[in-house]
Amino acid sequence: MDDQSRMLQTLAGVNLAGHSVQGGMALPPPPHGHEGADGDGRKQDIGDILHQIMTITDQSLDEAQAKKHALNCHRMKPALFSVLCEIKEKTGLSIRGAQEEDPPDPQLMRLDNMLLAEGVSGPEKGGGSAAAAAAAAASGGSSDNSIEHSDYRAKLTQIRQIYHTELEKYEQACNEFTTHVMNLLREQSRTRPISPKEIERMVGIIHRKFSSIQMQLKQSTCEAVMILRSRFLDARRKRRNFSKQATEILNEYFYSHLSNPYPSEEAKEELAKKCSITVSQVSNWFGNKRIRYKKNIGKFQEEANLYAAKTAVTAAHAVAAAVQNNQTNSPTTPNSGSSGSFNLPNSGDMFMNMQSLNGDSYQGSQVGANVQSQVDTLRHVINQTGGYSDGLGGNSLYSPHNLNANGGWQDATTPSSVTSPTEGPGSVHSDTSN
């Protein structure tokens, strides 16, 4: 009790600088030469107060409660409280000008909107899962896409669970700390003046401090969602090479229509069905193929010759089958009064730089040895099977198609059919009608 009395008297009569207080005004210290026993006593009292403050942390809970009870029951306690109110009234003027409420953080609002749009925060109503399903439907709903988007939904659900678990921990820690501070301030309000409004202001400060943790959590969650989207739903991820069969079909159409490699909408739909791809993918493939062909014609000439020889062999087999079928069905040899016509499949507008079917040369770049051997074999098969004379080489079955000087495609005349002229009963010549 004596210690508490001496503490209150010291706080009421002495400030921290050692100046005496009288009527709320600090008096100048006496000259150094006139300091007496009172000055030494004040220094000793201040030293005792500082020592008690430093030993507060070493006190037990029972000792702290006992000193608190003694302070509240002391007769000078109301005087001490009034002095503290005066001090707070003077120092509180600078605090009143401070802004009471801060505007919401725009970055935090953007993070909240993104998490809500992705279905991570708020009630689970699809969110990113619905986006994944829409992307799967747009890509054709193949099994690979379905598996990928099911994995996306599973990963998104996992991110959502982790986010909500960490958010609950954050809210629990924030509430516990806020409750502790509020109880502490209410307890201290018995000794020093603390208004309820000041307690609310302190709660707001605590929440703003904790909001940095919340922003970090939401930022990391948004980054995880963006990485997940770039891995599963990015358009560049959807780009895959076509199958070998689809590439063969598209290349065959391209080189067989090299004079005008712009398929119609009906042709695109037909090619899309054959290749099991979409019409837009067919359009993109032809656009890219035309650009690559124009940039490097020499490189693609060998490929064009390969497809030319391949399709020529197919056409020769069809001609041979048609001739054999005609000989089987018509026992008499056609004379000058009768003529038969045979339609070659894809005979018109077929290949670039191919001068003749059984001629001696190709125009354009040098044909490889394997292609030349196929041409020689083809010429031999046609001569042996159909009895064609060398007159076939005199006429050009495949017209060369060139690019314009400005890079455009130049159309060439398209042969329509191959007919047998009326010369003799023992020979059949080819003739192209434009």
Curated annotation (Swiss-Prot):
Taxonomy, superkingdom: Eukaryota
Q: Where are stretches of biased composition, namely Polar residues?
A: 403-422
List UniProt keywords, sorted A-Z.
Activator, DNA-binding, Homeobox, Nucleus, Transcription, Transcription regulation
The subcellular localization recorded is: Nucleus
Q: Which spans does this entry mark as compositional bias, Basic and acidic residues?
A: 32-41
Look up keyword Transmembrane and say if it applies.
no
Which tissues and organs express this gene's product?
Answer: Ubiquitously expressed.
Region (PBC-A): which ranges?
48-127
Q: GO biological process annotations for this chain's record?
A: adult locomotory behavior; animal organ morphogenesis; anterior compartment pattern formation; brain development; dorsal spinal cord development; embryonic organ development; eye development; neuron development
Bias (Low complexity) occurs at 326-341
Chain intervals for the UniProt region annotation (Disordered): 20-41, 326-349, 403-434
Task: Give the matching Pfam families.
Answer: Homeobox_KN, PBC
**Whereabouts does the entry annotate DNA binding, in residue ranges?**
235-297
One GO CC term on file: transcription regulator complex
Which InterPro entries does the entry link to? HD, Homeobox_CS, Homeodomain-like_sf, KN_HD, PBX_PBC_dom, TALE_homeobox
> Coiled-coil ranges per the record?
none
Looking at the record, the residues that make up the PBC domain are: 41-234
Output the PROSITE patterns linked to this UniProt entry: HOMEOBOX_1, HOMEOBOX_2, PBC
- Residues of the region (PBC-B) are 130-234
- Explain the purpose of this protein: Transcriptional activator that binds the sequence 5'-ATCAATCAA-3'.
PANTHER family the UniProt entry points to: HOMEOBOX PROTEIN TRANSCRIPTION FACTORS
Q: Which family does it belong to?
A: Belongs to the TALE/PBX homeobox family.
Q: How does it assemble?
A: Interacts with PBXIP1.
Query: What name is this protein filed under?
Result: Pre-B-cell leukemia transcription factor 3
Native organism = Homo sapiens
